Regions:
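Cytosolic nucleotide-utilizing catalytic cores of signal-transduction proteins
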Residues: 1-185
Length: 185
């Protein structure tokens, strides 16, 4: 229930967070990493349930929830470096490949009240990972920070605002002469 309330934005301040920790009789300590997993196939819910089951033994310090057709894994006491992080990423990659799913991993963070920002990071990692590297199954947000910043702006701009005039001229030449851009260059 805690992870559901946290991801839904119902825990808004330190007092509420501490009350949850008291009620659960545990404290979920930083650093944190949030992972999102999406499956885009006909049996999406079944795939996410199977992925959830497979991921439950990956890490000792994690909370898992399927929320709005996305599987979220909150890893707490997360290692910032080293073999355990690499092993987690490697194991997760194998799992998502098996189910033809995609996963995005946020940057490390230390404040659970800012989880919404990191939720966006995970979903952006998946979105821009699919655009820039369609075969990737595991996308780290840190690898897609620049596209996450630039793509929304480029999508709103007319092509001639960012396309150099020289490329327009080459495209026109190629159309007139039935040639291709690469050989023309």
């Amino acid at each position: 229930v805690f992870i559901s309330e946290l991801l839904s934005g119902n825990i808004k301040n330190e007092k509420q967070l501490n009350e949850w920790f008291q009620d659960m009789n545990c404290e979920i300590l930083p650093p944190y990493i949030l992972t999102a997993v999406t499956a885009r196939n006909s049996d999406e819910k079944l795939a996410l349930s199977m992925i959830r089951r497979s991921c439950q033994s990956l890490l000792p310090n994690q909370l898992i929830l399927i929320h709005d057709n996305v599987l979220y894994i909150l890893h707490y006491k997360a290692s910032k470096k080293g073999s355990s992080l690499h092993e987690y990423q490697s194991s997760l990659t194998k799992i998502v490949k098996r189910f033809h799913a995609q996963a995005g991993i946020s940057q490390h963070f230390s404040n659970l009240l800012l989880i919404e920002d990191y939720k966006i990071q995970t979903l952006d990692a998946i979105k821009y990972g699919q655009i820039l590297n369609p075969d990737a199954r595991l996308c780290l947000y840190q690898d897609y920070i620049l596209p996450a910043i630039l793509y929304p702006r480029i999508e709103q701009m007319p092509v001639n605002n960012y396309m150099p005039k020289s490329l327009e001229n080459m495209n026109a030449y190629d159309m007139e002469n039935a040639t291709e851009l690469l050989p023309t260059l």
